[in-house]
């Protein structure tokens, strides 16, 4: 297992280094392997494709860190995630632009959607339209994250989270006005 993690980490480092100068779409598995002196067979033993490697980077660097160290909920978890993206903005700025079948955006959606679904179903109950709301808010959050991190100089994470909170408050206030 230790050798496996060393190999995966070497491939991840190679991809990150390549992404500093090369658009993701132009990076091949051969490029990644050449960068860390491995063969393609080693790559494919561990990953399906380069998208799988990007997702593994997020899972190991962020998700495993959260599961091991912090038990964050609510806005604290959003801020923690934003801090991670901000610290790694050069990498995720490029990763979030890719919209292929196995892209990071899709992986991120798979992680965010169940969390949002839980909150939305708690608020709405088991309405038949709950899936619509989950998809709507997932799209909004993922788009907001992508737009934020893609800026040349993204606003600090704390400010971004404050703006997200404000957006939700505006939605709630608008709904209250419409119902009165």
Name every feature range the model reports, one short phrase each.
Residues 74, 97, 101, 126-130, ...:
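Residue-level recognition of alpha-helical structural elements
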Residues 15, 19, 57, 61, ...:
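Hydrophobic recognition helices of helix-based DNA-binding modules
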Residues 147-180:
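C-terminal peripheral helix-coil segments that are non-catalytic and often amphipathic
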């Amino acid at each position: 297992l230790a050798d496996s993690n060393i190999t995966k980490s070497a491939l991840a480092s190679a991809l990150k280094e390549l992404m500093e100068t090369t658009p993701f779409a132009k990076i091949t598995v051969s490029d990644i392997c050449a960068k860390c002196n491995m063969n393609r067979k080693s790559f494919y033993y561990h990953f399906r494709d380069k998208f799988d490697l990007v997702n593994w980077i997020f899972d190991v660097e962020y998700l495993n860190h959260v599961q091991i160290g912090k038990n964050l909920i609510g806005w604290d978890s959003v801020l923690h995630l934003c801090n991670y993206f901000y610290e790694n903005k050069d990498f995720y700025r490029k990763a979030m632009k890719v919209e292929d079948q196995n892209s990071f955006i899709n992986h991120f959606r798979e992680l965010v959607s169940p969390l949002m679904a839980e909150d939305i179903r708690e608020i709405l109950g088991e309405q038949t339209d709950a899936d619509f709301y989950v998809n709507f808010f997932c799209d909004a959050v993922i788009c907001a994250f992508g737009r934020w991190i893609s800026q040349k100089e993204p606003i600090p994470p704390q400010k971004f989270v404050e703006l997200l909170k404000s957006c939700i408050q505006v939605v709630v206030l608008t709904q209250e006005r419409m119902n009165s």
